[in-house]
Amino acid sequence: MKSVVIIPSRMASTRLPGKPLMAIDGIPMIQRVWQQAIESNIGEVFVACSEIEVHDLIVSNGGKAIMTDPNLPSGTDRVHSAFLKINNNKDIDIIINLQGDMPLINPEHIFKVIDPIKRNFTIGTLATNLNDNELNNPNVTKVEVDFKKNEIAQALSFYREVTIENKNLYHHVGIYSYTPDSINTFINL
């Protein structure tokens, strides 16, 4: 199966404007995310952006960047727009949406997000154990999953605020995998 990683990036973040170019130990955040995606060795890596500064940074470091409409409503819309531009041969089986603010993501986890697609799910994501500090933090997305001793299972619901105690809550990791049909369907909801 042919996979591609697309990293959506925008400078006009509501919570932290200019975030993609903010340096972490001297290297812009978006460049660090792009490097982690390259390290995963899963397939081609693209940064989907609407600002020329981000585009030029990635290209000047040997990467591939796709310019997208600055008015797109979400990162997934940006990923979809870039996917349509690069899938000329209709040969991409898996699209990985890696958030542009995940500079510390383990490259192995990027590779792991395709496992649900290989098992006939149409959308995949990752979850990890939730610690006590994260449970009531609205900035941490929680996902309800009943793994039943399986490593891969269906997500039942996503939460920011938790109003009931649920033992099946996990910390949702903001990376997704899609089949071409599922991302097309998702965008058109």
Q: Which role fits each region the language model picked out?
A:
Residues 22, 55, 184:
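Nucleotide phosphate-binding site architecture
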Residues 42, 90-92, 119-122:
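Short, high-confidence coil segments that cap the C-terminus of an alpha-helix
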Residues 8, 97-99, 126-127:
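Short beta-strand segments
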Residues 30, 101, 179:
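Residue-level signal for inorganic ion chemistry
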Residues 46, 52-98, 102-112:
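Short phosphate-binding loop-to-helix
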Residues 2-49:
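N-terminal glycine-rich phosphate-binding loop and ensuing alpha1 helix
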Residues 105-189:
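Conserved core of the sugar-phosphate nucleotidyltransferase
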